[in-house]
Amino acid sequence: MAKFHKLIVLAVAALAVSATLAVAADRKQAKSQVEFGIRVAAQGLWREAIYRWERAAELDPTYPAVWNNLAVGYEQSGQFEKAKQAYEKATALDPHNAYIKQNFDLFKEINDRANRANPR
């Protein structure tokens, strides 16, 4: 019985280690997609950037930079509701990130100003 218990403990430990390695691999792949998205966004290729950042979000939905970059991309492509949702997700994941907060505050200010100028 003790031998069986040890085998179960070892199996659970191995599963935990493999899950941790999978998460680290996902973050690494997500980071690669984020960086590629930044490069193509700098060239004005916003659809490609959004595609890369959406792929990164699939790989690692807990990565705040993904959601911040997606929000910026959505803003650039006129998808303001999606931008707002992405900023909210980024803020929820990293509430103390000054860069995300600054981007979201600027988005809200511009969006509010546009809505006041052109009420529906």
Predicted regions mapped to residue ranges:
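Register position in tetratricopeptide repeats
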Residues: A42-Q43, Q76-S77, L106-R113
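Helix-start (N-cap) detector for alpha-helical repeat units in TPR-like alpha-solenoids
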Residues: A30-K31, P64-A65, A98-Y99
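Conserved structural position within tetratricopeptide repeats
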Residues: R55-E58, T91-A92
